[in-house]
């Protein structure tokens, strides 16, 4: 995690040069030196562009060991497809977890021809990979081209998991470890007659706005391991038409079932009880 912070300038250069790179960030608590516990405090840094300039990373958020393996394979394909850095954003809990993983063969994905690489100029025009523009006009054209690419990514690469949302009156939104915890909360609440559902973003950027298009829930709770970052994207996704609340633990701590039930009871006037 600290290395990602130190390398933000380099990541900005990679985005400007449109180089396909895969970056892994196992997010631990901070700021500063921080601790080794689980955290999701790098959400803003990862999804909004941590370095200088109007750039974006494709950000994938696994919730278990198998997905850390699968999404890393996917990240290389997405990086090649879009000529863009891709970040796999896990957290300290996942990074220290031991689970069975099925080692899969890489899929034969049809990727664009690399007509930009500098592999020798025999019998063709020269190519140049650069992250700078010497005139304002060229710089603006580059910026507009990047934004068009980012819009294409938003249109085609949004990914999420939904769980028990078809009849849900209330929703939890959580990614990574929080998404994993939230699924057990949904099952426990359903056992007590509360129609709770889960949306687990898999791409944090592009944020899966499409997952919220037909949601008619009475309220939403975002579950995060930070001081409230993803909640901003959830509010934008529902156009602030649904009340969105927030619960978190920080510093490497994880939320308990009773604490989440207490928050749901408080915000939505429910009567959920642990252990029923």
Each PLM stretch: what is its role?
Residues 83-162:
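Conformationally flexible catalytic loops at phosphate/diphosphate-handling active centers
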Residues 224-276:
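Peripheral docking tails and interdomain loops at the edges
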Residues 159-194, 199, 207-211:
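Redox- and metal-dependent alpha/beta enzyme cores, enriched for Fe-S-associated oxidoreductases
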Residues 1-48, 58-79:
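Thiamine diphosphate
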Residues 4-7, 201-209, 253:
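Short acidic loop-to-helix transition motifs that present clustered carboxylates
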Residues 22-27, 60-62, 87-91, 223-224, ...:
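Short beta-strand segments
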Residues 57-111, 259-276:
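Structural signature of the thiamine diphosphate
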